[in-house]
Amino acid sequence: MNVSYLSKRFAEMKKYETDCMNKLMDFAKFLYIQGHLSITEFRNSMKVLEANGAESPAYEMN
């Protein structure tokens, strides 16, 4: 799983292109939840996206 594959799938489904790693990370999570990615593909995509600057949002617990 690489960034170009996720970008291509994103553009096909969303009808626009993005180079935002955070959007691609959210999209990879969506694909995993929908059953389009295996756990191995999901984990590998998360590693690649994080290496390219993607960040999960930080949530504050009050």
From Swiss-Prot:
Cited InterPro entries: YppF (IPR025553)
Lineage: superkingdom: Bacteria
Q: Name one Pfam family in it.
A: YppF
Q: What is this protein called?
A: Uncharacterized protein YppF
Q: Identify the species of origin.
A: Bacillus subtilis (strain 168)
Gene symbol here is yppF
